[in-house]
Amino acid sequence: MEDKEDVENVDDVGYLPILFLYIAYAFIIFNGKLAEFIGKLKGERYLHTPEGYAPLFVEFEYFYQRRMYGRIKDAWDRPINSIAGAWIDVMPRASKHYSQRLELTGGKTIKCLNLGSYNYLGFAQNEGPVADKVIDSIYKYGVYTGSTSAEVGLSEPQRDLENLTARFVGKEDAIVFEMGFATNSGTLPALIGKGGLIISDSLNHASLATGCKNTGCKVKVFRHNDSKHLEEVIRESIIQGQPRTHRPWTMILIIIEGIYSMEGEVANLPEILAIKKKYKCYLYIDEAHSIGALGKTGRGIVDYYGIDPKEIDILMGTYTKSFGAIGGYVASDKSLIDHLRQSSFSQVYANSMSPVCAVQALEALRVIMGEDGTDTGAKKLKQLHDNSNYFREKIREMGFVILGNKDSPVIPLMLFNPAKLSAFSRLCLEKHIAVVVVGYPATPLTEPRTRFCISASHTIEDLDWALRQIDEIGDLITLKFHKGKYLKSK
């Protein structure tokens, strides 16, 4: 097992960031409510629901969008005009008023170091062996199958991708879907239904939450990555049984992620696996961010911990991160995969993956496995590992509060204040760095952050340059609260 670094505790930052956070929210909410009170007196139409109609929005969420998100929305949805590689061209936008739609200015694009995308292994490119194979596939297969996989839409590249994916992750068979989100939301209802129990990590992705709701079964949540609480929930659930009847559950399914995308944390798989075996539950792991990014051979969290993949019942992953493509997969025993081919909504009713995208994922996978006859895949994996740990260590030394584990390519940096979401994003753009800032509802209202995504395509020179810029920004807007102290750069 590889050594893991302890996760930073947000509670250790001291009282000042939290105090300023609540002051900022109080100021924003007070001003927003005052403005809307005056607006209602003036008869502003957007503040009144037409007579006889139900409101279209939940009031708090609508207020948040109008009075908070509206002021800082330029920090999101920035269009790019290039390949999403190590460096990207960002198209400038502007609006006359914060509440109005942002429009492209037509000005010169801004060349930025890309620290925001999921291009973990650097396969987002338009040249090289993988890109050449993709271009050739357009002439052979076209870009559209015109049908579902269950009918006549299963292309040769998709079939090959399913076979190679199963071999890569160490399972008997795999099924491929055209969309990562739909892989979870459409698969879970085919796995479990009435009489079953899902026990889900509290920070699981929205696609998993949607899939859980679609099953119609009982869903319980355990504290994030807390194996002790997971066991407590399982024990209590087994003792109580199903609601009202108290009959035994038909099955219990534990759902976790390999790497949690907003926290950068690696799941505590050894302890969770021991609990799964002890209580004879099933285990479903979403490896969207860990497959291709964790472990010496890139085989995800089971590779990272040295666990036999046969011990995991269901492995799910996506091709949208490390592989530079689209879509997702589920890998398991052949009998279960055959069941999904007939029962999963995302397989039966959705179009199959574009052959071109299947070739991209297939060829990237061959490179990672070394089946292209080169050591390019091994070099990419090592570069990603080295880059991630180098960037994490350097930015922590500067005094920033960061989350996550060693070896994770996802490195969240806590901003704490909603005003600093836009400030950090805008200052980074001025310094030619493209970053993703994250706030409510993707994170708790009190924990806004930025999320750096490291890539094998970054050089050490790229990262050193970015660290210098981020260091200056951290001093300018007071972000260095590591261990409860504000640390001025030396």
Swiss-Prot record:
Residue stretches spanning the membrane: 10-30
GO BP of this protein: ceramide biosynthetic process; sphingolipid biosynthetic process; sphingosine biosynthetic process
Pfam family, one: Aminotran_1_2
Modified-residue entries (N6-(pyridoxal phosphate)lysine), positions: K321
Functional pathway: Lipid metabolism; sphingolipid metabolism
Entry's Gene Ontology molecular function annotations: pyridoxal phosphate binding; serine C-palmitoyltransferase activity
Family as reported in the entry's similarity comment: Belongs to the class-II pyridoxal-phosphate-dependent aminotransferase family.
Oligomer and partners: Forms a heterodimer with sptA.
Protein name: Serine palmitoyltransferase 2
Naturally occurring in which organism (per UniProt): Dictyostelium discoideum
Annotated gene: sptB
